[in-house]
A protein has these predicted regions:
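Glycoside hydrolase catalytic-domain context in secreted enzymes
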Residues: 1-619, 623, 637-641, 646, ...
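A generic signature of intrinsically disordered, low-complexity regions enriched in glycine/proline
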Residues: 47, 368, 507, 572, ...
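Terminal connector regions
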Residues: 618-665
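Charged, amphipathic alpha-helical linkers/stalks
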Residues: 646, 653-723
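Long, low-hydrophobicity ectodomains and other hydrophilic envelope-associated domains
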Residues: 689-806
C-alpha cells in the first residue's frame, strides 16, 4: 500500500494536477512510474454498464453483459434497505469481476416533479426513505471493496437544460428536502465518492459550490472521500479543486492540467489545495485496486438473476383489486394482450442502460404457469401509432377468455436521461384498447410498466391494477407469480400519484428553458404538498394493497419512537410496511402536515401477530432555522402517526418534545401561502420573502456557458446555422417518436463542455475563440481558434512527454 503523504512529496506539481482529471471516458490517469494505477469507473445504479469498446456516457454503445436489477424507482416501493444492501453487494461483486473500481450510483435526486425524465433512476419524493435505501446500496457495493458514488449532488430535478440551469432554492428547503437524503447516505453508508451535479445552485455551479462541498458535505457531515464531476460537468476546474471537487471527468486532456498550473502560479489556488484533493483520491485508487486484484473474475449470474427476481417481487405494488379478482385461480382461461407482455420494458434509457445477462418474458412465464393461456395479441403499437387491426384482434381474443391480462406502459423513449416527459399520460392507443376490451370483457387485469407516475383516468375500465414499475431482467417471473398468487404483492408507493399533472405544485414552471429554476413550492413536494393542501390524489404516498389484511394495535410512543402490534387478519401470508409520520398542530413555523420519520417491514403468517418497534433518530423533530443558521427543534406537542400510507393512519399518540429554538426563523411572518401549503401559484413577493433576497434573473450571455440550444442568440451566421441544424435534427427525431439522445445532449450542452469532453482535442482557449466568433468578431475569433488549436497540440504533446518521463 502506497503512503499518500510520501507520494505527494515525490510527485511534481504538474503530475499532481494531471491526476485530478480523467484519462479516458471511464478511466482515471495512472502513473506506473510512481506506482499509481489507472482505475475504471462505470455507470451502475441498477446494473453495471462497463463499455469495453468505444465508450460514451449516454448508454448509446454496447456494454459488457451484467445483471439488470429493478430500477431505484421500483426497489423504493419495497421500502427495504436490507434488500438494497443485497443488490448493492451484487453490483459490487460484478464490478469487481469486471475490474471496475467505482460504481456511479445510486441516484439520490428528490422527485420534485413526476415529469423528470430520469425519475426511474431515483428512489423517492421523500428524503428519509431515499437516504435509507441509498445507504443500503452503498454499504452493499462497498462490502466488495468497490467504491460507491451516490449522485447527483445537489438540487438536480430536471433533464431540460441540466448542464446550465440554476436551481434557486431557499436554505431551509435545501437542507430539509434536497440534502437530507444525501446526509443520511453519507453518514450511514460512508461512500468513498460522491458525484456533483451539472447545475448551478443559487448562482454557483454545484461542482465548485463551497457551501455545498466544503461547508456542508465535508465540514458538517465529515465526508472525506472524492467528489467526482458528472461527465463534462466541470465549469471552473481550479475553483472546483479549491472548493472541494476532487476528480474532473471524463477526459479534458492537458488543458485541464495547464488550468490548474496557471491557477497555482496566479495564487487563485495553492498547491496544498491540490494535495488535499489527492489525499482524497489516491487512497480510493489504491484501496479499490488492491481489492479488485484479489477479487474473482467471475460472478454467479444465476444467483444474481434470482436476487433480481426477488427484488422485483418485493417491489410490485397492487393498486386495485376489485372483487378480489387477483390472484387468478388455477386453470383460469386468460387472454394475454399488450406488446409489453412479449417485448418487456424493464429498464430506462440513457447512461444506466444495462446489457442484461438474460431477460425473462411475461408471456412465456404465464404459459409455463398453472393458468390456461388461450392466446396472445399485441393489441397496440407501443410507440403510440393507432392500429385498428391490432385492436380488433385483441378484442376478439378477449371475448373468449375468463380474464384479460393487459400489459400497458410507457415506451422506451418516454423516460430517459437527457429529456423530460411532456405529460403523464399513457399513449392514447393503449387507453382506447383498454376501453374497447372493457366493453367485451370487464374482467381485466392491467399490468403497468413505467419508471414513474402516470395519470389513470382509465382506472374504472379495469378490475385490477398491478404496478410492475421497471422490474429489471427477472421482473416477468415476479409478475407471473403475483398474478397466480405464488407471490403476495406487498410493495407500497414511494411517490404520490396525482389525479392530474396540473395538481403537482411545480407543474406551472417545470422544465422550461429559462436559465433559472425557481423552487417556489419550498418544502411542499409530493405528499408534503398534497396532505397539507388537502388535495385529493389518485394513489397516496405509501399506498399499496395486498392479498391479505393487517390490523394495528397497542401503540406506545415517546420521543425515542413507537412500538405496536401488527396482526395478519387475512388468510394468506404477507408483508406489511408500517409507516411512522410526525405532525405538529398549531406550529409557529410553516411545515408539512405530515412527514415520514420511520418505517418497518413485518412478514406474518395468517393469524400471526408481532410486536414491532420503530425508532426515531436525530432528524425526527429538527428543522433548519434560517435565522440562527442551524438545526433546531420546535418544542411542544407532536402527534406520532402510524399507518399503512400517508392517508391511511391507523394509530396516533401525542407526545411532548423539548425545544431548542430561541429565535423565529422568519423576520417577516407574512408567508400565508406557505402556512396553508397553497403553493401552486406563489407570487414573486412571497418567494423573495422565503429566499430572503430578490429572485435572481437569469440572462442569456454569449460566453462559455451558452448552450448549443441557445446559439440563436449569437451574432454570427455560424452560430445560427449550428442552432438551426440541431433544432431540425431534434424535431425530426421527435416526429419519428425516437428523440436522439446524442443530439439532445449536444443541444443542452454549454460551449465549455467542448473542452471537457474531447480528450484534449479542444482547449478552453479555443472555446474562447468560438465565443468571439459568436459575439460577432468572426475574423478575430477564427484566427484565435486556429492559433489556439496549433498551440494546444504542441502543449499537449510536450506535457505527455514530460509525464511519461521521456
Amino acid at each position: 500500500m502506497q503512503n499518500t503523504e510520501l507520494l505527494l512529496k515525490e510527485l511534481t506539481l504538474e503530475e499532481k494536477c494531471a491526476l485530478l482529471s480523467g484519462a479516458e471516458t471511464f478511466k482515471t490517469r495512472g502513473m506506473p512510474e510512481h506506482g499509481i494505477p489507472q482505475i475504471w469507473l462505470s455507470d451502475g445504479p441498477h446494473g453495471l454498464r462497463k463499455q469495453a469498446g468505444e465508450s460514451d456516457h449516454l448508454g448509446l454503445n454496447p456494454s459488457v453483459p451484467a445483471t439488470c436489477f429493478p430500477t431505484a424507482s421500483a426497489v423504493a416501493n419495497s421500502w427495504d434497505a436490507a434488500l438494497g444492501e443485497e443488490i448493492g453487494a451484487a453490483l459490487g461483486e460484478e464490478a469487481a469481476a469486471q475490474e471496475v473500481s467505482v460504481v456511479l450510483g445510486p441516484g439520490l435526486n428528490m422527485k420534485r416533479n413526476p415529469l423528470c425524465g430520469r425519475s426511474f433512476e431515483y428512489f423517492s419524493e421523500d428524503p428519509y426513505l431515499a437516504g435509507k435505501l441509498a445507504a443500503g446500496y452503498i454499504r452493499g457495493i462497498q462490502s466488495k471493496g468497490v467504491a460507491a458514488c451516490p449522485k447527483h449532488f445537489a438540487v438536480n430535478s430536471q433533464e431540460t437544460r441540466r448542464m446550465a440551469s440554476d436551481s434557486i432554492v431557499d436554505e431551509r428547503t435545501l437542507r430539509e428536502i434536497y440534502l437530507t437524503g444525501f446526509e443520511i447516505a453519507v453518514k450511514e453508508g460512508h461512500p468513498r465518492s460522491i458525484m456533483s451535479s451539472y447545475n448551478l445552485v443559487n448562482g454557483t455551479y454545484a461542482n465548485e459550490n463551497k457551501h455545498l462541498l466544503m461547508e456542508i458535505l465535508r465540514g458538517e457531515w465529515g465526508f472525506d472521500g472524492a467528489v467526482i464531476t458528472d461527465w463534462g460537468g466541470s465549469n471552473d476546474h481550479a475553483l472546483g479543486v479549491k472548493n472541494g471537487s476532487t476528480l474532473e471527468m471524463p477526459a479534458p486532456g492537458g488543458d485541464s492540467v495547464r488550468e490548474l498550473l496557471a491557477a497555482v502560479e496566479s495564487g487563485k489556488i495553492s498547491e496544498s489545495d491540490i494535495d488535499a484533493r489527492l489525499s482524497e483520491l489516491l487512497p480510493l485508487v489504491f484501496d479499490t485496486k488492491a481489492a479488485l486484484d484479489a477479487a474473482p473474475r467471475e460472478f454467479d449470474a444465476a444467483a444474481h438473476h434470482a436476487l433480481a427476481r426477488r427484488a422485483a417481487e418485493e417491489s410490485l405494488v397492487l393498486l386495485k383489486n376489485e372483487g378480489s379478482l387477483l390472484p387468478l385461480a388455477v386453470g383460469s382461461k386468460v387472454a394475454v394482450i399488450g406488446d409489453f407482455a412479449k417485448n418487456p420494458r424493464y429498464q430506462g434509457a440513457g447512461s444506466s442502460m444495462v446489457n442484461s445477462t438474460q431477460v425473462d418474458v411475461l408471456l412465456d412465464k404465464l404459459i409455463d404457469s398453472e393458468l390456461n393461456v388461450i392466446g396472445y395479441q399485441q393489441g397496440f403499437d407501443r410507440h403510440g401509432k393507432p392500429d385498428a387491426a391490432l385492436q380488433k384482434s385483441a378484442c376478439e381474443l378477449a371475448t373468449q377468455a375468463d380474464t384479460v391480462i393487459l400489459c400497458m406502459g410507457l415506451d422506451e423513449i418516454a423516460e430517459s436521461e437527457g429529456l423530460d416527459r411532456s405529460n403523464l399520460r399513457l399513449a392514447q392507443n393503449q387507453v382506447d384498447l383498454l376501453q374497447a376490451e372493457a366493453a367485451v370483457n370487464p374482467k381485466i387485469v392491467v399490468v403497468l410498466y413505467s419508471g414513474s407516475v402516470v395519470e389513470t383516468p382509465w382506472l374504472d375500465n379495469c378490475q385490477a391494477l398491478l404496478y410492475a414499475a421497471l422490474g429489471g431482467q427477472a421482473g416477468a417471473g415476479a409478475v407471473a407469480d403475483a398474478l397466480t398468487g405464488k407471490v403476495n404483492p406487498c410493495g407500497k408507493l414511494a411517490e404520490t400519484w396525482p389525479l392530474a399533472y396540473a395538481d403537482v405544485p411545480s407543474a406551472a414552471d417545470f422544465a422550461t428553458r429559462r436559465k433559472t429554476v425557481e423552487y417556489r413550492e419550498g418544502l411542499y413536494i409530493g405528499y408534503r404538498y398534497f396532505t397539507t393542501a388537502e388535495k385529493a390524489v389518485r394513489f397516496p404516498f405509501g399506498y399499496g394493497m395486498s392479498y391479505t389484511t393487517f390490523a394495528y394495535s397497542d401503540m406506545v410512543a415517546d420521543e425515542q419512537g413507537v412500538s405496536l402490534t401488527v396482526t395478519n387478519t387475512g388468510s394468506v401470508a404477507g408483508t406489511e410496511i408500517v409507516q411512522l409520520y410526525i405532525a405538529k398542530k398549531n406550529s409557529e413555523l410553516f411545515r408539512p402536515a405530515k412527514e415520514l420519520k420511520g418505517f418497518a417491514r413485518v412478514t406474518l403468517a395468517p393469524g400471526e401477530k408481532q410486536r414491532i418497534t420503530i425508532m426515531l433518530d436525530d432528524k425526527a423533530f429538527r428543522f433548519w432555522n434560517v435565522k440562527a443558521n442551524r438545526w433546531e427543534i420546535e418544542g411542544g406537542e407532536y402527534e406520532l402517526l402510524v399507518g399503512a400510507s400517508v392517508e391511511d393512519i391507523r394509530l396516533c399518540e401525542k407526545i411532548s418534545v423539548h425545544g431548542t429554538a430561541t429565535v423565529h426563523p422568519y423576520e417577516d411572518r407574512d408567508l400565508d401561502c406557505y402556512y396553508k401549503g397553497d403553493v401552486l401559484h406563489v407570487s414573486d413577493a412571497d418567494f423573495e420573502k422565503l429566499l430572503g433576497h430578490p429572485i435572481p434573473k437569469g440572462k442569456t450571455k454569449i460566453d462559455r456557458n451558452l448552450t448549443l440550444g441557445e446559439l440563436n442568440h449569437a451574432r454570427s451566421p455560424l452560430g445560427w446555422l449550428v442552432w438551426l441544424v440541431l433544432t431540425i435534427l431534434l424535431d425530426v427525431s421527435y416526429k419519428r417518436g425516437k428523440p436522439d439522445l446524442n443530439i439532445l445532449f449536444q443541444y443542452n450542452m454549454p460551449l465549455r463542455a467542448l473542452a471537457k469532453m474531447t480528450n484534449g482535442a479542444i482547449s478552453m482557449c479555443m472555446v474562447d475563440g468560438i465565443v468571439m466568433e459568436l459575439q460577432g468578431f468572426w475574423i478575430l475569433g477564427l484566427v484565435r481558434v486556429i492559433y489556439e488549436a496549433i498551440k494546444n497540440v504542441v502543449l499537449n504533446a510536450q506535457m505527455e512527454k514530460r509525464l511519461r518521463g521521456a
